[in-house]
């Protein structure tokens, strides 16, 4: 065989192939595996086994006595960072006779711009729209020159104009004229939007209080998510939610919550039958509702702090628009059931309707009377004026007789006028005090629902007694007429306050009774 010559590259290739020979992988099993079958499934379902030990025994931390007895040092400055000299009070006293520095006086001077007289200076702020600036990016200041109107001046002028445009009702006459203006404005035809001149009305409908439904107190319930049932959708879900009920419940631990009940299939059929027949309910039928959700609640009503009035509108075809009041606002949030606490998922609400009893009917009538407020105020004012004038005439006769019989019948008119002025001041003060007491009592009645009207009656009696004293002290016929005018004013103001407070007390007590009673349904 002829000799061959190998190059250095061939020698390296042969050496590299011999050095990187693959080693066969060994199996992890000593013996040879014959079968490769997988394990069978567990013949029964997995189960939860109760853990008999306390779950917190490995993680619960208890402080030792050394940690409890140790006192941590609070390293702070002795003056807490506030350097105040409490010993010498003259340290921070300012001398009123001190002279300011010349540089500081410049800061206190007002900037007064002298009127520019030269024609050249007047051309500086002139805007020439057809001229192009050489810089593409420029501010408003650079584009339109120096502006003499400062933003501070603009803000001050706008605030002043706002105050002049707004009607600030400071006195009684301006308030009365503003109230009367609202009635006149309501009679005017609406031709355009109040803030958008191009928007015109499509249809104009009158708005009235809902006398039909005002007797029933309404509440606004706000859910944090859609309470619709999961197994229903569309019109079926809306029909079920329209017949839903909420009731307060309590779990085994004594925690209160709100349960949301939905009607069953049998109840839905009964409610549809009642609607077709035009009935509110069937007296002998029983309606079943099953619990669907559990909520925590937050309630706000008229007695709550920060309460805001809320109304809703009802559009009735061919009749108009009616508004009603939402006295209560309820916010519902989903309730988290604690571990180990049995929830009321199987709770069933059984409802059987009945007729309303006397207290509920009285509460409805009180709400209707509160809305109508049909007190004949003018007739009452006339009757009160007549009574006061008759009593004042009798008192004037008694006073004139006493003056004829008495030895001091020739007193000066100035003294009687002075006494009359003092008595008028006393009457005004007592009227103010009685009005403040009435207002405080009315607020208290709205919150606590009391039915006491003795304060207003006492104020009326005080007004009549004071008027009697005026009649006895006055001597001349003119003073008697003045006393009659004062007495008629005080007497005409106080009885209406008592009647109004009495009416509000009846309304409040009736509303409290209505809220405490059920809405015409017994739930088991």
UniProtKB/Swiss-Prot annotation:
Residues 359-374, 396-407, 437-447 have a biased composition (Basic and acidic residues). InterPro entries: RNA_pol_II-assoc_Paf1 (IPR007133). Keywords: Coiled coil, Nucleus, Transcription, Transcription regulation. Residues 490-500, 510-524 have a biased composition (Low complexity). Residues 351-384, 412-442 form a coiled coil. One of its GO terms (cellular component) is Cdc73/Paf1 complex. One of its GO terms (biological process) is negative regulation of transcription by RNA polymerase II. Its main location: nucleus. It is found in: Nucleus. Residues 375-384, 420-436, 448-461, 468-481 have a biased composition (Acidic residues). Pfam families: Paf1 (PF03985). Residues 1-23, 359-524 are annotated as: Disordered. GO terms for molecular function: chromatin binding; RNA polymerase II complex binding. Component of the PAF1 complex, which at least consists of cdc73, paf1, leo1, ctr9 and rtf1. The PAF1 complex interacts with PHF5A. Belongs to the PAF1 family. Component of the PAF1 complex (PAF1C) which has multiple functions during transcription by RNA polymerase II. PAF1C associates with RNA polymerase II, is involved in transcriptional elongation and in histone modifications including methylation on histone H3 'Lys-4' (H3K4me3). PANTHER family: RNA POLYMERASE II-ASSOCIATED FACTOR 1 HOMOLOG. This is RNA polymerase II-associated factor 1 homolog. It comes from Xenopus laevis (African clawed frog).
